[in-house]
């Protein structure tokens, strides 16, 4: 059973990487049968319980520091894992996992992380196109820097379990993404 956690800034187009992985064989997780628990539900519950800020609102990298998660949450994850025992390759993507990377890393030593980043100019262009006129460009850039610094720090501390993907490079050479995951 291989488990992949995809994490990337909301502007990184991480969903396209997730879609590609599903096309080549990664399954979505089976939700727990009793409570319909999904990885996204677990992350949303953790965000609510630990009162994490909205990912796009963070401009100080310290706000992306790892949240120390209580063991009381382990049973939810165990239920999710048990419902995916027969799932050979499964995974999901969620930008809010940035707060809980250490939690997922420690709860299951076999989880692999795919970390997706994009050039900040693309994030800024998307922000300008989708935001009101009062957009603070500095906040958008600071948010991108803070998020991707946490992503890079985690990658550097856990290279044996992580693949770092530049979205532009991925677009031009998708097939090579599966080599580091083998």
Language-model segments: residues:
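PAPS-dependent sulfotransferase catalytic domain
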Residues: 51-55, 78-182
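PAPS-dependent sulfotransferase catalytic core
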Residues: 1-73
């Amino acid at each position: 059973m291989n488990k992949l956690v995809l994490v990337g800034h909301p502007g990184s187009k991480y969903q396209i990487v997730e879609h590609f992985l599903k096309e080549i064989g990664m399954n979505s997780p089976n939700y727990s049968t009793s409570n319909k628990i999904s990885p996204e539900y677990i992350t949303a519950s953790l965000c609510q319980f630990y009162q994490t800020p909205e990912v796009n609102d963070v401009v100080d990298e310290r706000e992306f520091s790892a949240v120390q998660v209580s063991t009381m949450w382990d049973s939810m994850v165990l239920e999710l894992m048990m419902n995916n025992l027969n799932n050979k390759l499964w995974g999901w993507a969620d930008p809010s996992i940035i707060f809980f990377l250490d939690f997922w890393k420690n709860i299951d030593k076999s989880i692999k992380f795919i970390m997706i980043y994009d050039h900040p100019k693309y994030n800024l262009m998307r922000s300008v196109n989708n935001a009101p006129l009062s957009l603070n460009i500095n906040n958008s850039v600071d948010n991108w820097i803070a998020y991707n610094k946490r992503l890079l720090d985690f990658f550097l501390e856990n290279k044996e379990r992580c693949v770092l993907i530049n979205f532009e490079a991925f677009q031009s050479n998708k097939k090579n993404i599966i080599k580091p995951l083998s």
